[in-house]
């Protein structure tokens, strides 16, 4: 998890939070909301990836550390705060959600690549009842379930998936 946390994020806000579900009781609870029952039941662990819509509240913690570690001055931090406060105030709730989804997606790919490099497998799951997850895990309303990630060792190879070629996806101007 710490290795995945170095993933880049918008303004370095790191809006991801997660719940590691690795007990039979926890997996049974998550199973009530996870449409992928097989992965839920057979994985070593499931991660519930959450997006924190109150990410700006971590400003002092994140940028205070940058000052303490000598990466920026207090003056630069405060100038950055002023600019970001204006941006945050002008940002709609929907845009905040989009930014959090985007950043959590980057974290997920970082995590999946690290898991694979360590010899394990993962499956990223978007098919689940987000409202039910919020209820089951009694999440604060600032936290939104983004995706589930199954982790373990695969018993057999998955069927190959097909991919479109870049030439069918790209335009040049």
Each model region followed by its residue ranges:
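Acidic, surface-exposed loops and disordered segments
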Residues: 1-173
